[in-house]
Amino acid sequence: MTSLMCRDDALVQVLNKAGYNPILLPRTGLEPPEIYLYEQGVLRRWGRLATAVPAGSLPDTLQEGEQADISHSETSRKSLQAAGNFLNDALRCIGVNSAPKLDLSFARGAVVTFSFSGVTWRGLDPADIGAALNQGFDPAGLSEEKLRLGMVHVAYDYAYADAIDMTLATDGSAKVDVQALNINGFIDLGGKAECEVKSSTTISFKGKGKPAAFACKLGQVKRAKNRWTFNAREVVGQGFAPEEGAAEPYLLRRGQVLIVEDMQAT
């Protein structure tokens, strides 16, 4: 599977509107800018851009800040099975690649929503990426053909989360009170994250190590007239942009969560 279809999900829509591509990265501790190859619907992480441009061509310090508009934005309501699948994937974003036990049977009869909290971003201005590329871009192992066809991209901004909140709701005919549960009897995160009951309807999962990015801003790398171009904005089709012909942030797949593969361990 190369992506998860989530076109109607409220959180994915918020991320897309902010210019972010939702992603599932293979590991934690990664920082932008990084090179990606998008080929036949598969997004593969190549490695750090710094290894493919001259030393000193990129700024020494990343910009960073909070993403208040994304923090606490909820997903659409999910069934119990869909909630289990989403939580299993979302835990990877806070460093839990596999949970020894993830039993959500206590939520039977409820609908579930999720949100990320403590959302921050780190990245560079797209203009800095373009300037570095034109000082000399040499991505070893990527063919001229892939560059010519626009398959090469750079993630210049990553969004991270401190925690994932899971909230339960019912139609009124049933009552859910997670404070009355021994939550450790249902969920075991293998010591890689903390599970805290925040209220009668909300459980929070907080990672202990470095988080994985759960979304990124991408731009496309192309060569034109002996110069490199870095396109972080695009003119999208009718119905997507507020004004016809307006430039919007570059998105690989609207309404989808992209599953990232690693090409190499750098």
Curated annotation (Swiss-Prot):
Q: Where is this region: C-terminal region?
A: 245-266
Membrane topology label: Multi-pass membrane protein
> Which is one Gene Ontology cellular component term of this protein?
cytoplasm
Describe PTMs of this protein.
Palmitoylation helps stabilize the inactive state; may self palmitoylate. Palmitoylation plays a significant role in pore formation.
Q: Where is this site: Cleavage?
A: E244, G245
Q: Where is the lipid attached (S-palmitoyl cysteine)?
A: C6
Family designation: Belongs to the bacterial gasdermin family.
Q: What is the protein's given name?
A: Gasdermin bGSDM
Q: Which organism does this sequence originate in?
A: Piscinibacter sakaiensis (Ideonella sakaiensis)
